[in-house]
Amino acid sequence: MSEETSTIIFEHPLNEKMRSWLRIENSLIQLNSFQSINSLSSALSFFRAVSEFIEVLDRGEIRAELLKELEKRQKKLQQWLSFPNVDKEIVSHIINELSESACALSKAPRIGQHLKQDKIISLVKQRLSIPGGCCSFDVPTLHLWLNLPQTVRTEKLTCWQEGLYPLQNALNALLTLIRQSDTFKPVLSHNGFYQDSTEEGELLRIKLLASQQIYPQVSGHKNRYAIRFLPLDSEHGTIPSELPFEISCC
């Protein structure tokens, strides 16, 4: 895709539940982006991501919320099977995927507990808020660990990541279903502003051309939302009187 036609999708939650899910998803993406830890800088980047993930996780009962939502979605899809002109094979496949994800999540140990109880993570986490607080004399355990064979660190990293797979798979299945519940529609904003109403919307998705160098600021809730478009260059950038973009309310 050329730079002229490449697009950016901005997502905005319309309730606190979705806000929490998106933050956890973002943390999981960061954690899984690490293929190896081979330096102090990569180690600190990983441990900061772990620390943020633990904090987000501690703000709610994520397992109970996800299991409840997965069950709700399965029941709704079961009703679809009785509708005419529905692709029963696809719907049944989605139901099975949600069911398997829910089963794995319900059987998994307490989410994130293996991270909270890990000695290295605990030691580093305590020092992250201190500027320059992870020198070798501050955390000699980390210094030793970073000088062990790469295979040892990779094995540990894999263990940390795999312990989150039940949560990751369940969340991915749910968010994919939500994102696919509505299609993008072309609309126009006037003088950099757009507003609309929705019935029980959970997630707002806004698609803009990257070349426009414009981003949205969203305010709203499940029934109504407003979007203000702003230029990346706050001093010299401008917003056209009519701005075409695409929107999806899931």
Curated annotation (Swiss-Prot):
Question: Which keywords appear in this protein's UniProt record, sorted alphabetically?
Answer: Cell cycle, Cell division, Cytoplasm, Septation
Kindly give the InterPro entries that the UniProt entry links to this protein.
ZapD (IPR009777), ZapD_C (IPR027462), ZapD_sf (IPR036268)
Where located?
Cytoplasm
**Where's it mainly located?**
cytoplasm
Looking at the UniProt entry, the stretches that span the membrane are none
Mind listing the GO biological process terms from this record?
division septum assembly; FtsZ-dependent cytokinesis
Q: Which SUPFAM superfamilies match?
A: YacF-like (SSF160950)
Instruction: Answer yes or no on keyword Lipoprotein.
Output: no
Q: What superkingdom does the record give? A: Bacteria
Gene3D superfamilies registered for this protein in UniProt: YacF-like (1.10.3900.10), YacF-like domains (2.60.440.10)
Q: Which Pfam families match?
A: ZapD
GO CC: one term?
A: cytoplasm
The yes or no answer to whether the keyword Cell division is present is yes
The record's annotation in PANTHER family points to: CELL DIVISION PROTEIN ZAPD
Q: Which family does it belong to?
A: Belongs to the ZapD family.
Function in brief? Cell division factor that enhances FtsZ-ring assembly. Directly interacts with FtsZ and promotes bundling of FtsZ protofilaments, with a reduction in FtsZ GTPase activity.
Oligomer and partners: Interacts with FtsZ.
Return the protein name.
Answer: Cell division protein ZapD
